[in-house]
Amino acid sequence: MRRILLLFILLFLCERRCITCVFFLNFVRMKLIADSGSTKTDWALVDDCNHSTLLKTQGLNPFHQSEEEMFRVFHDELLPQLCGNIREVFYYGSGVRDDQKAKMECLLRKVVPGLETIEVNGDLLGAARALCGRNEGIACILGTGANSCLFDGQRIIRNTPPLGYILGDEGSGAVLGIRFVNALYKGILSDTIRQDFEWSTGLSLSAIIERVYRQPLANRFLASLSVHIHRYLDDSKVRVMLTDHFRQFFIRNIAPYHRTDLPVSAVGSIAFYYQEQLQDAAKQEGYALGKIERSPLHALIEYHRSV
């Protein structure tokens, strides 16, 4: 009962940032957990009672953004939403390479001073921890892009390079969008599907070519087309296309691990919305699926609660 009362007081104070509130909140220890992509970042503020408050900011990617741009996001968007005595930060993000971890840690310490623990890792380790916990397994990201790894329960021990949507990225939303457009305009799919797609999206072949070849972020545009495929799952050719798309992912990205004994788990919108076809592809290639999650954040909250 006392914990419930403390929780309600905490929620009330988070909304009213007065001097008394700040004094009280300094006694509440918090963890801050982030799952960051290039377009948005999902944050979870977790208190001692294991209550989570979910926050959002725009995306962060140290590969594409300057320190000044990222600090502005931290300072202007994240900081006003924070409350409590944050002692630990666990950040998982796209574009985080080993040579950029120190830069991200420094920026976070400027925004959240006095941290006892700070971890900055790539999104693939975040996916592995969310999907496998502390167990051995194969973890995958199937969203706009695709990635995978062999995880030993503590660290990533192997990674097949995805190579991006031009050279690879089998299983991704971007490559699925390419295959869908190809099938629409080369007569593999019916005129009925093509006409319905053009009517519902307002896109023509010339408009698609303009977006892909003459405008930036073609991968995101192509991935956005993949969501429309869900409307045509009653068509056998669409289902075959999807299953083959995922089979290529297993053949080119998962087979090099030589671990058919391990479950293959995946996070991301493509894995989540096309689970049935992903399951069919896994079965055909001799793999068993494990967990499928749309987002890793809630599983990461559970992972760090038990640390």
Q: Predicted segment positions?
A:
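Cysteine-centered motifs
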Residues: 14, 18-21
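Polybasic, low-complexity association/targeting segments
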Residues: 90-97
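Cofactor-binding loop segments of dinucleotide-utilizing enzymes, especially the Rossmann-like FAD-
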Residues: 94, 123, 269
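Phosphate-binding/catalytic loop of phosphoryl-transfer enzymes
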Residues: 97-189
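ATP-binding/phosphotransfer module of carbohydrate and carboxylate kinases, centering on a glycine-rich
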Residues: 25-88, 131-138, 181-307
